Regions:
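Buried hydrophobic packing segments
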Residues: 57, 61, 108, 112, ...
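Short, conserved micro-motifs enriched in small and acidic residues
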Residues: 44-52, 100-102, 200, 225, ...
Length: 242
């Protein structure tokens, strides 16, 4: 089932991501961002910035007035307006630990899907956060990455060049907990990459794959839909495989 064309879904993603960005950037120090609020639906520790960003996105969702199903890392699955076939898959802060500590690889991830499968995602939006800054620092808000099925992948409005096959020079590694890296060391070595980068955000790492800045990504445990739904569309629209 196609998405209802009464809504500009790309513009919605832009608004929702900007609102979430502003919510995160309002917490100007590591101490403020590090306040824990419990555990999200996915089981991870939730910080005040996760909740603030999620609340901002849900305000935009509710303003749409469209019956849909929202799936978020913190709240889980929520029927909005009675529920519907349209699904919005949200990770309000992918890379929460980075964001908490003031490291640059963190983002808001929003995917719009017409069905329950990854292959049903029609729009993906990834908005980089810079948690070192406050909302008043507009010129350095972070890059916007997005893709529309059948229309390509973009970074700040510029189309990403199609990906081409080449040597595996730089491999992105996610879920890089020490015990998982140790257990998988032989398998990682057998892949044959010259260098490894562990950035701490699945969505951001996939965006860098889509842009050709990383050659591939491997996760050491299964990836949740909220982490990958938006960015995997960028990879496929840029000509990569997921």
């Amino acid at each position: 089932m196609p998405l209802p064309d009464s809504t500009d879904w790309v513009e919605f993603c832009r608004r929702a991501a900007d609102a979430a960005r502003d919510a995160v950037h309002a917490y100007g120090s590591t101490a403020e961002r590090a306040v824990e609020t419990g555990r999200g639906e996915g089981g991870d520790t939730a910080y005040v910035i996760d909740r603030a960003a999620e609340d901002a996105v849900f305000e935009e969702i509710e303003a749409l007035g469209v019956p849909l199903t929202a799936i978020s890392e913190e709240r889980g699955e929520i029927a909005v307006g009675g529920g519907g076939d349209v699904r919005i898959v949200i990770d309000p802060v992918d890379g929460s630990l980075n964001a908490k500590r003031g490291l640059p690889f963190a983002c808001v991830s929003i995917a719009i899907s017409s069905g329950p499968r990854m292959g049903d995602v029609e729009v993906g939006w990834v908005a980089e956060l810079d948690p070192r800054l406050t909302a008043s620092d507009e010129p350095r808000r972070g890059r916007d990455w997005w893709a529309v099925r059948g229309e390509g992948a973009f970074r700040d409005g510029e189309a990403l060049a199609p990906l081409s096959a080449g040597p595996l020079e730089v491999l992105g590694l996610e879920t890089a907990r020490p015990e998982l890296v140790a257990a998988a060391s032989s398998a990682i070595e057998s892949v044959g990459a010259r260098r490894i980068r562990a950035l701490g955000s699945v969505a951001m790492t996939l965006c860098l794959v889509a842009a050709g800045q990383l050659d591939a990504m491997v996760s050491l445990r299964p990836i949740r839909s909220v982490d990958a739904a938006a960015a995997q569309l960028l990879v496929t629209e840029a000509g990569g495989a997921v």
